[in-house]
Amino acid sequence: MLTVALPKGELLKNSIRLLKSVGLDFSAFLDSGNRQLQITDASGRAKGLLVRGQDVPVYVEYGQAQIGIIGYDVLREKQPQVAHLVDLQFGYCRMSVAVKASSPYKSPLDLPAHSRVASKYVNSAREFFQGLDLPVEIVPLYGSVELGPITGMSEAIVDIVSTGRTLKENGLVEITTLYESTARLIAHPLSYRLNTGNLHQLVEQLREGVLSELPILT
């Protein structure tokens, strides 16, 4: 039996919708009263694990799940040893550098050397500024990183942006985009090579499902 790691949060609904289109029904995870973290599809073909987004690639890398669905931002940050199979074309967002709208900084290169940059995506932020050859101090924050510039603790932030509304409401503005992110289908490399549980067929069905679902997945 295949095991699928599903992310809690914004990607869950469309992940379940896509899996249901290929005959795997984990919609019980969407029930408001559900407290189960593991359920079996009614067909008996697969088991679903409901985990934090950051943990999806961990379960897949260690083989406790053969496949999983997670945002590219998490994959880029964590660099897990997993097979990247399909861009699922939903869950769009972008990784951006943002500063106070009232600041003089119009691009990252305007930031003074050794500025502080707050982010929960420490590796992505460090990689970006190293690429610019601009020395900055990355300040790890795991709550509302917008407070960094607001309180004066940091000159900038690196964070995921969907609509930009949160930035605007807190007086911040984007000055550049590091990369764009969508949901991705990943697999345990050995399980995929061995075609465990007829995994290749399922992946192909999901790939075809993405194409047919494109008009409604957002």
Swiss-Prot record:
The record lists its disulfide bonds as none
- Kindly give the Gene3D superfamilies that the UniProt entry links to this protein: Periplasmic binding protein-like II (3.40.190.10)
Cellular compartments per GO CC: cytoplasm
Organism equals Trichormus variabilis (strain ATCC 29413 / PCC 7937) (Anabaena variabilis)
- The first-level EC class reads transferase
What do we know about how this protein assembles, alone or with others? Heteromultimer composed of HisG and HisZ subunits.
Enzyme nomenclature, EC number: 2.4.2.17
Subcellular location, in the record's words? Answer: Cytoplasm
**Pfam families membership:** HisG (PF01634)
Role this protein plays: Catalyzes the condensation of ATP and 5-phosphoribose 1-diphosphate to form N'-(5'-phosphoribosyl)-ATP (PR-ATP). Has a crucial role in the pathway because the rate of histidine biosynthesis seems to be controlled primarily by regulation of HisG enzymatic activity.
Quoted from the entry, the domain comment is:
Lacks the C-terminal regulatory region which is replaced by HisZ.
Gene coding for it: hisG
Q: Which domain of life is it from?
A: Bacteria
Q: Tell me one GO biological process term.
A: L-histidine biosynthetic process
The identity of this protein, by name, is ATP phosphoribosyltransferase
**Family, similarity comment:** Belongs to the ATP phosphoribosyltransferase family. Short subfamily.
Please give one Gene Ontology molecular function term for this protein: ATP binding
For this UniProt record, give its keywords in alphabetical order, as a comma-separated list.
Answer: Amino-acid biosynthesis, ATP-binding, Cytoplasm, Glycosyltransferase, Histidine biosynthesis, Nucleotide-binding, Transferase
Pathway(s): Amino-acid biosynthesis; L-histidine biosynthesis; L-histidine from 5-phospho-alpha-D-ribose 1-diphosphate: step 1/9
> Which CDD domains does this chain map to?
PBP2_HisGs
The root-end lineage is: Bacteria, Bacillati, Cyanobacteriota, Cyanophyceae, Nostocales
Question: Which reaction is catalysed here?
Answer: 1-(5-phospho-beta-D-ribosyl)-ATP + diphosphate = 5-phospho-alpha-D-ribose 1-diphosphate + ATP
User: Taking the first listed entry, what is the main subcellular location of this protein, grouped into a coarse class?
Assistant: cytoplasm
